[in-house]
């Protein structure tokens, strides 16, 4: 949800050009939400030192607790990118307000360098054989679920009719 909120902030700023809102509210929100992504992921040797975010639930809540959900990783990267954009924009508009925010949030150059490293090295699952980006690391290993075999009265609220562990193992 953090990245979705950050995306809404950035979209609002892009559409309205409301620089005062950027200075008064948005920059701080974008920075703090970006920090979440820098805390929850890691550079994984097993993924060529790409930045991975594991044990997340993306927008497909029927596939919960997965590694490197494509949507989550993409939105996390964009959240961090938006935070860096906001800081640059704020500094160019009102350096005093920028300096106050940097002090308030205790932002250091090392943190921004780390964010840049994340942006440039975010991991996205890719299936070489099919030439597609699956929704997460394990998606292609899951068994296809033949929806035509689900009775109509059981299609809604799958968790009421099927155990979550059964649902999680399906495509």
Regions found by a protein language model. Give the residues of each.
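A conserved active-site cap/scaffold subdomain adjacent to cofactor or substrate pockets
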Residues: 72-96, 100, 116
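Flexible glycine/proline-rich, aromatic-decorated loop/lid segments
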Residues: 41-57
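Active-site core of glycosidic bond-cleaving carbohydrate-active enzymes
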Residues: 81, 100-171
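Acidic/His metal-coordination segments adjacent to aromatic residues that form catalytic metal sites
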Residues: 53-68
